[in-house]
C-alpha cells in the first residue's frame, strides 16, 4: 500500500467525519478544563463547623485564630511561654519594659516578610516603640511579669492576614459579630458558622447545615445516632464553680462557706474534679489544697440556712444536684436561672475561663470590682497576687502561687467543682 494511497484514505476519512472529530476535540478540552477546576473541590477536605458564641474578628476562638496566625509568643502544654513570631525577649528593668526580637525568616500568609511595623496589639495601657524592623519595645505603666503571655494572642495585618497555614477566604458579619467565616489551606476548606445557643447549633446539625459541632457540653441528642462520631475531651482551661457573694450577710463568714462546700457530694458531678482556680496542666498548679470532700459532720450548723443559687441555663442540671445535696442537710435552697451574673446574688454557678498564666489578679484582688465576682477582700491574698505579677523568676513565682491557691481555697470565695467535659460531634 503506497504512502499516497494512505494519505488519500486519511484525507477522505477526515472529510467525511470532520464534524464529529471537531466536536470530540471540543468536548475533550472542556472535560479537561472542568477537571482542572472542579476536581480539587471534589477531592479536597471540606468541613462546615458550628460553634456557639458571639465573636468578632478581633476576638475569635482559639480553634480558628491559631490556624490563621500566631502571636509574638506561644504557650506549650505545660503553660510555659516559648518563642513564636518573636525569637527572643528580655526585660531590662524587672518587668516594666519588654523588648522583643522577631524572627527575620518568618513571612505573612500573603508572602511578605514580617516586620515590627506590622505588629499591633492595640494596648490601651502600654506604649510601643519600633526600634527597627526586627525589634519592638513595649513600655508598661507598672511591672507585669506575665506580659509575654498576653502576647501569645495571634496578630494579624489588615484583612485578617496572618502567619498560619490557613487564609481567610470570606467573612460575613452581622452587627459586628461573626456569622460565617471561610478559611482555606491548599486543597482544604473549612467553613465556620456561629450560633447563639446549643439548641440552634444542634438543630443546624440535624438539618445538615453543618457537618461538625465544636465543643458542646450535652451530646445526648446524638447518643443513638449511628452516623456520627462523638469525641470527648476535658476542658482543663475551664472550671465550673459556685461563687459566693462574700458581702452577703449570710455568707460573709468563712466557716459558713466552708461548710457549704463540705455539704456537696463532688464525686458524682460531670467532668473531672477541680480543687482550685488553676488548670492542673499549669506549672503553678498546687495539688495539695484542701479538697472539701463531702463531710456531713461539718454541716450541722447549716440547717434552715436560706440560699438562692443563681445559675446559667446550661448548668441547670448541676444546680439541681447541688440543691439536692444542700437540702439533705437542711438548707433551704431556691434555684434562679439567669443569663448573666445578678448584681445582688448570694451564690452563682458558672463556668470560668482559667487564665493562661497563674496570675489571677483580676479575679480575686480586692481592687478589681468589675471582675472580682465574689467581692473578696483579703489582704494576704491581695499581697500574694501583687507579688506574683511583678516577680520575673518562675520558681519564685511558683512558690507565690502555691501559697495563693492554698489561702484562696481556705477562704472559699468559691467552691471549685469540676473541669467540664466538652464534646465534638461529626458525621462519619
Where do the language-model regions lie?
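Hydrophobic membrane-insertion alpha-helices, especially the h-region
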Residues: 18-36
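Gly/Pro-rich hinge or "lid" segments in bacterial periplasmic/extracellular proteins
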Residues: 76, 133, 139-192, 196-199
Amino acid at each position: 500500500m503506497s504512502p499516497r494511497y494512505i494519505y488519500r484514505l486519511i484525507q477522505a476519512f477526515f472529510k467525511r467525519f470532520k464534524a464529529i472529530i471537531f466536536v470530540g476535540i471540543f468536548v475533550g478540552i472542556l472535560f479537561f478544563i472542568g477537571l482542572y477546576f472542579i476536581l480539587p473541590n471534589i477531592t479536597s477536605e471540606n468541613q462546615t463547623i458550628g460553634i456557639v458564641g458571639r465573636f468578632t474578628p478581633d476576638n475569635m476562638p482559639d480553634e480558628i485564630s491559631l490556624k490563621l496566625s500566631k502571636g509574638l509568643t506561644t504557650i506549650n502544654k505545660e503553660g510555659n511561654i516559648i518563642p513564636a513570631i518573636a525569637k527572643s525577649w528580655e526585660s531590662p528593668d524587672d518587668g516594666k519594659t519588654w523588648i522583643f526580637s522577631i524572627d527575620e525568616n518568618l513571612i505573612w500568609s500573603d508572602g511578605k516578610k514580617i516586620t515590627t511595623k506590622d505588629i499591633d496589639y492595640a494596648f490601651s495601657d502600654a506604649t510601643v516603640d519600633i526600634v527597627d524592623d526586627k525589634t519592638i519595645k513595649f513600655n508598661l505603666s507598672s511591672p507585669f511579669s506575665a506580659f509575654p503571655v498576653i502576647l501569645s494572642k495571634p496578630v494579624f495585618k489588615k484583612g485578617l492576614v496572618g502567619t498560619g497555614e490557613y487564609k481567610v477566604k470570606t467573612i460575613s458579619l452581622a452587627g459586628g459579630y461573626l456569622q460565617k467565616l471561610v478559611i482555606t489551606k491548599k486543597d482544604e476548606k473549612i467553613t465556620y458558622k456561629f450560633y447563639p445557643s446549643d439548641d440552634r447549633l444542634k438543630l443546624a446539625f440535624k438539618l445538615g447545615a453543618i457537618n461538625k459541632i465544636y465543643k458542646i457540653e450535652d451530646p445526648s441528642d446524638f447518643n443513638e445516632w449511628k452516623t456520627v462520631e462523638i469525641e470527648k475531651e476535658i476542658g482543663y482551661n475551664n472550671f465550673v464553680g459556685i461563687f459566693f457573694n462574700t458581702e452577703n450577710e449570710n455568707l460573709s463568714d468563712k466557716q459558713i462557706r466552708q461548710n457549704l462546700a463540705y455539704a456537696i457530694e463532688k464525686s458524682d458531678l460531670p467532668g473531672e474534679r477541680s480543687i482550685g482556680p488553676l488548670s492542673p496542666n499549669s506549672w503553678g498548679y498546687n495539688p495539695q489544697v484542701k479538697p472539701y470532700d463531702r463531710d456531713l459532720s461539718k454541716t450541722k450548723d447549716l440547717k434552715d440556712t436560706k440560699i438562692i443559687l443563681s445559675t446559667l441555663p446550661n448548668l441547670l442540671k448541676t444546680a439541681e444536684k447541688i440543691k439536692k445535696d444542700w437540702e439533705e442537710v437542711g438548707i433551704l435552697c431556691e434555684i434562679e436561672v439567669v443569663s448573666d451574673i445578678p448584681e445582688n446574688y448570694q451564690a452563682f454557678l458558672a463556668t470560668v475561663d482559667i487564665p493562661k498564666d497563674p496570675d489571677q489578679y483580676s479575679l480575686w484582688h480586692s481592687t478589681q470590682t468589675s471582675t472580682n465576682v465574689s467581692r473578696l477582700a483579703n489582704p494576704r491574698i491581695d499581697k500574694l497576687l501583687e507579688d506574683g505579677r511583678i516577680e520575673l523568676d518562675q520558681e519564685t513565682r511558683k512558690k507565690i502561687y502555691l501559697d495563693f491557691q492554698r489561702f484562696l481555697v481556705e477562704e472559699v470565695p468559691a467552691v471549685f467543682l469540676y473541669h467540664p467535659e466538652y464534646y465534638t460531634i461529626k458525621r462519619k
